[in-house]
Amino acid sequence: RDDVESRGLGDVYKRQFMYDAPSKSKHVNQAELDYIEQDNREAGSAPMTDEKDEKRMKFWQCFSYKQTWAFVFGKFMTDGVWWFFLFWTPSYLNTQFGIKTSDPLGMALIFTLYAVTMLSIYGGKLPTIFINRTGMNPYAARMKAMLIFAFFPLVVLLAQPLGTVSPWFPVILIGIGGAAHQSWSANIFSTVGDMFPRTAIASITGIGGMAGGVGSMILQKVAGNLFVYASGTTMIDGKEVEMTKELLEQGAQFVHPAMTFMGFEGKPAGYFVIFCVCAVAYLLGWVIMKALVPKYKPIVLE
């Protein structure tokens, strides 16, 4: 406890007496300052002002701007896809292929999934390339990049069909979808700084983060219920329960038949449906964002 308290007091001391804004710090040279503030000097960006001189946006006032709702819907529509890939992929491998993540093959597949996802580290560079080459404003550059990234998750539509050939195909395709999400995510967060004054960025980011969390919760809940429904049900000791492979092998009869979709039956059919949702979520999110904020319009508090 004493150690925690001493560290806390140390942090307070550093903040109060040692920290200074980069523009005022004697330890930051001009080259470093230019690098820190480069985003604020991009074409079309609002002029720099001292944060103390900026007017504050009240929390409820945030909801009166279309720019807020564009960010909210962009997060709501897409965050759940990322968490679905992370949370359900191990279960998918076990259900579809009988591969456990504790098996050597399962470990190799999960490692490959995350390795492919790391391609997203290049996603944040694309808007800068557009700005430098065409001189477009930051918001337009990021939206153009996000549209490109929104097409990549469409490959997830092929996860189930190609999964009949090898488990490596869906894992790689899901990894590409995950990489596209991270590239999308890096840019959608940056649109907040493009459109809102610095004093409002934390509030808008928090609102969007909550919307993403709600969207994630809904998608995971719907997916779980869909997988149970897709499996069909049987009667055990007078109770209706989910049909499993083991019960089916023991001769259990369906009370409600397994779901079929595009040639797949049972849980694989359910996964196919959710993969379709994940594949188009980014394009739908982009269309909503573009409809709400068709052109770059920074908010200026008066």
Label for each model-derived stretch:
Residues 2-13:
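Single conserved hydrophobic/aromatic residue that forms the stacking wall/gate
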Residues 120-121, 193-232:
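A late C-terminal transmembrane helix in Major Facilitator Superfamily
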Residues 139-187:
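C-terminal transmembrane helical hairpin of 12-TM major facilitator-type secondary transporters
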Residues 98-116, 141-142, 168-172, 203-206, ...:
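Loop-to-transmembrane helix entry
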Residues 93-94, 126-127, 131, 222-232, ...:
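Interfacial helix-cap and linker-helix signal at transmembrane-aqueous boundaries
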Residues 14-18, 156-162, 267, 271-302:
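Multi-pass alpha-helical transporter architecture, strongest
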